A protein has these predicted regions:
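Short Fe-S-cluster ligation motifs
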Residues: 4-20, 29, 43, 47, ...
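Feature captures the FAD/FMN-dependent oxidoreductase FAD-binding
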Residues: 140, 145-149, 197-246, 354-367, ...
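Conserved hydrophobic helix-helix packing surfaces used for dimerization/oligomerization
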Residues: 146-148, 169, 284, 437
Length: 490
């Protein structure tokens, strides 16, 4: 441990963001660079706890106190070695992870937690700058061929791990560029796409084969893949959006959030000349209070929307934890994103009733009613508040209320993978009902976080490697703690 009283001596600091009035004019990342001296101070705040709950909070099991100590001592090779032992892509999670590790930080009981996400990002970027992250192809090949379908974070992680195990990996992507949700779902002001391109170029050097513009069932059939490859990983995400199912949701101008966000990312990436869904000069309603809804706010502000309102069915969370939500649980508190800072009205405890439209079939308004949440029989339910129903202007609406499961496009069935009633595939140890076909990420577990997708890709790779070779030398999440501890101790 570098500084025994660092958590007392230094306060939590995070990067300064660019002025909202300036940054809404571009799609660049919003945060300014963070100085090396300040980063060392933030790493020094880690208490090197006897029981580091941050491990448990991180789906990847990142060995956080150890890499914090390495950063404090400016041992960048050690820091990236520790971080990469559990996380294939710290440059992604260091930018877009909601940091459940920080919510579990012991310091967070009565102080601000350690800025773990910031430290993680800076380890990755420093390692790239110093040439510490470079192509590392496997020394031997097994002669086995693996197909990975879907190039989101789960597919990329599975491909990376399986390639390191010595298998010949081909990653199939239906879109023009690699990245899946990272590429087409997350705005550039949160994750600029050169970050993905840099990693993909590295994986290509290491031997991973990328086949873009390749949609299973069109460009190539599932049967052909099953015949050509020794095993398959399906990792195409949970892309089926949850519908609002209210009257008038067929009007022009009512869209699922990913239609809007995906097209905008295609514009920035040079795949489209302009976004066919424009928020310029429009009264925008965002239905759903999560991160995807927040991304719609930020993008609409950059389009020049006349007004933006975000609606949330649930009640407004408290600013601080309350007694029924103690540490180390995920804090159910009010969160203000960078997009909220740029401008939007937020309304909580509100129910959408009906879209209204004109004779041309265009949406013009949305009827709302306030609701009151009450506990009945140990369960929370809501009631409409009489006299609060009203219709507000709405020229453009984005539905961002989550996803129900994998896209219903017949992909699972084509590969012989049976599904459950909730549309998720049946699986045991990441293996589908077709022994040759494995599952990873949101496609297997349902909608989740990028960090969970990477974890899923890693765990799936171990089970697939065992299927092909009988045993696997790839690290499992739990085993990696002991491996890294031994390396550090040695």
């Amino acid at each position: 441990m570098g500084a025994k009283e660092g958590f007392i001596q230094f306060k939590r600091e995070t990067p300064v963001s660019r002025d909202p009035r300036e940054r809404v004019n571009d799609y660049r990342e919003i945060y300014e660079p963070f100085s090396g001296e300040k980063l060392n101070e933030q790493a020094a705040r880690c208490m090197d706890c006897g029981v580091p709950f941050c491990h448990n909070g991180c789906p990847l099991g990142n060995v956080i106190p150890e890499f914090n100590d390495a950063v404090y001592n400016q041992e960048w090779g050690e820091a990236i070695s520790i971080l990469r032992s559990t996380n294939n892509f710290p440059e992604f999670t260091g930018r877009i992870c909601p940091a459940p590790c920080e919510a579990s930080c012991v310091l967070g009981i009565n102080k601000d937690p350690v800025a773990i996400e910031l430290i993680e990002k800076n380890i990755a970027e420093k390692a790239y700058d110093l040439g510490l992250i470079k192509a590392n192809p496997p020394e031997k090949r097994t002669g086995k061929k693996v197909a990975v379908i879907g190039s989101g974070p789960a597919g990329l992680a599975a491909a990376d791990q399986l390639n390191q195990a010595g298998h010949e990996v081909t990653l199939f992507e239906k879109d023009a560029k690699v990245g899946g949700l990272l590429r087409y779902g997350i705005p550039d002001f949160k994750l600029e796409k050169w970050v993905i391109d840099r990693r993909v170029a590295l994986m290509q050097e290491e031997g991973v084969i990328f086949s873009t513009n390749t949609e299973i069932g069109h460009s190539i059939q599932a049967d052909e893949i099953l015949k050509t490859f020794d095993a398959v990983v399906l990792s195409t995400g949970a892309a089926h959006p949850r519908a609002l199912n209210i009257k008038g949701d067929h009007y022009k101008g009512v869209h699922f959030a990913m239609e809007f966000l995906g097209k905008q990312n295609q514009v920035i990436g040079g795949e489209l000349a302009e976004n066919p869904i424009s928020a310029e000069g429009k009264h925008v309603i965002v239905i759903g209070g999560g991160d995807t809804g927040s991304d719609c706010i930020g993008t609409s502000n950059r389009h020049g929307a006349a007004s933006i309102t975000q609606l949330e069915l649930l009640p407004k969370p408290p600013k601080q934890r309350n007694f029924i939500n103690p540490w180390p649980e995920w804090p159910m508190t009010l969160k203000t994103s960078s997009s909220h800072e740029e401008g939007a009205e937020r309304i909580f405890s509100i129910l959408t009733k009906e879209f209204t439209g004109n004779e041309m079939g265009e949406v013009t308004g949305l009827t709302l009613v306030d609701i009151e949440w009450k506990e009945k029989g140990g369960r929370m339910s809501f009631e409409e508040i009489p006299g609060t129903e009203r219709t507000v202007p709405c020229d453009l609406a984005f539905i961002a209320i989550g996803y129900t499961g994998p896209a219903q496009n017949g992909l699972l069935q084509a590969f012989g993978a049976e599904t459950m009633e909730n549309s998720l595939p049946k699986s045991k140890n990441y293996q589908s009902t077709n022994p040759k076909v494995f599952l990873a990420g949101d496609m297997r577990r349902g909608q989740s976080l990028v960090v969970w997708a990477i974890s899923e890709g890693r765990e799936t790779a171990v089970k697939l490697d065992e299927y092909l070779m009988g045993t696997s030398s790839l690290p499992m999440k739990d085993e990696s703690f002991y491996q890294v501890d031994e390396q550090v101790a040695g």
